[in-house]
């Protein structure tokens, strides 16, 4: 399974006084990366661990604005659905055979850990990787799918994302603390990231 690794920032970094952009968002991938390399980065990188802890502290302090800013400006991200030449869905150069189930805004870290374990053990989904999201209140799971099921690659990816998200929402009892939780809505684009 191969995908693209993008370095931060995901959004422009602006000067807090003037509002001028001081660093544009990263739009081209740093490199192609394997699933094994993603796992190693998540589990072994002390730098990433420190950055993630900083992001999580903002969540724990209830500062959503700081959390989003830190997540967008400091964390690398991958495109589990495949390799991209640019950060746009029409820049997919090769599908990975993976889709991402992305559940955010759970009520607690304990609920996120429980859901992560449930997803990882699911015999229908059979994720190859499941991890807690940067906030600590969400889960990301990389799910394999049949590349040949639908001839159109983008449609195949989108339909598999939609199916997997609907399945997870129907089968698992998780509680979102957001009334209008768009992050948990199925059907996002193929360039959907799996932020570390």
Q: PLM features: what roles do these ranges have?
A:
Residues 2-137, 145-159:
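Signature for HUH/AEP ssDNA processing cores
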Residues 120-124, 162-163, 169-172:
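Catalytic phosphate/metal-binding cores of nucleic-acid and nucleotide-processing enzymes, i.e., regions
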Residues 132-139, 180-186:
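Short Gly/Ser/Thr- and Asp/Glu-enriched loop/turn motifs at secondary-structure junctions
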Residues 165-196:
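Flexible helix-coil linker/hinge segments at domain or subdomain boundaries
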């Amino acid at each position: 399974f191969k995908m693209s690794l993008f370095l931060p920032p995901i959004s422009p970094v602006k000067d807090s006084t003037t509002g001028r952009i001081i660093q544009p968002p990263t739009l081209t991938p740093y490199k192609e990366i394997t699933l094994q390399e993603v796992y190693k980065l998540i589990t072994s990188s002390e730098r990433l661990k420190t950055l993630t802890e900083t992001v999580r502290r903002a969540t724990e302090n209830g500062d959503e604005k700081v959390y989003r800013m830190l997540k967008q400006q400091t964390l690398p991200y991958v495109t589990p659905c495949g390799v991209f030449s640019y950060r746009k869905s029409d820049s997919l150069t090769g599908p990975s055979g993976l889709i991402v189930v992305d559940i955010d805004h759970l009520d607690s870290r304990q609920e996120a850990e429980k859901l992560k374990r449930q997803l990882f053990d699911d015999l229908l989904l059979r994720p190859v990787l499941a991890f807690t999201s940067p906030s600590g209140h969400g889960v990301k799971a990389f799910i394999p799918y049949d590349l040949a099921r639908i001839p159109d690659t983008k449609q195949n990816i989108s339909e598999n994302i939609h199916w997997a998200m609907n399945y997870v929402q129907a089968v698992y009892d998780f509680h979102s603390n957001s009334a209008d939780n768009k992050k948990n809505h199925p059907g996002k684009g193929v360039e959907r990231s799996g932020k570390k």
